[in-house]
């Protein structure tokens, strides 16, 4: 069974208010399901934007050193899981695996910059 992904809003995982999901498949084999994603409504999106605005002031007061630490943590996670992300890109987009690995590597480098 395909994994069902949720939205992350205001520090919590949540489904779409409609309860609906959208299924993503492999373009080369429509029977091969990648996962199910929340079919978010405009209200769901507006709630996420509102939550982001609510924490903007707190984030602004976060030191540049702490912000950099978050980016480095994200880079480390992405780098440690490069193969998983590259395989996902290859399955979903048909991208060559070497190209997908390179794309992940460039994302890691950007986060580390």
Q: PLM ranges: what are they?
A:
Residues 1-36, 69, 73:
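Terminal low-complexity tails and localization/encapsulation signals of metabolic enzymes
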Residues 30-113:
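Glycine-rich loop-to-alpha-helix module at the N-terminal edge of alpha/beta enzyme cores
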């Amino acid at each position: 069974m395909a994994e069902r992904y949720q939205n992350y809003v205001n520090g919590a995982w949540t489904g779409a208010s409609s309860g609906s999901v959208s299924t993503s498949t492999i373009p080369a084999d429509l029977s091969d399901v990648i996962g199910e994603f929340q079919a978010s409504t405009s209200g769901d999106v507006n709630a996420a934007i509102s939550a982001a605005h609510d924490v903007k002031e707190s984030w602004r007061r976060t030191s540049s050193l702490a912000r950099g630490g978050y980016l480095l943590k994200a880079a480390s996670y992405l780098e440690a899981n490069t193969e998983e992300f590259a395989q996902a890109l290859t399955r979903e987009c048909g991208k060559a695996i070497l190209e997908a690995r390179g794309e992940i590597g460039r994302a890691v480098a950007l986060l580390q910059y």
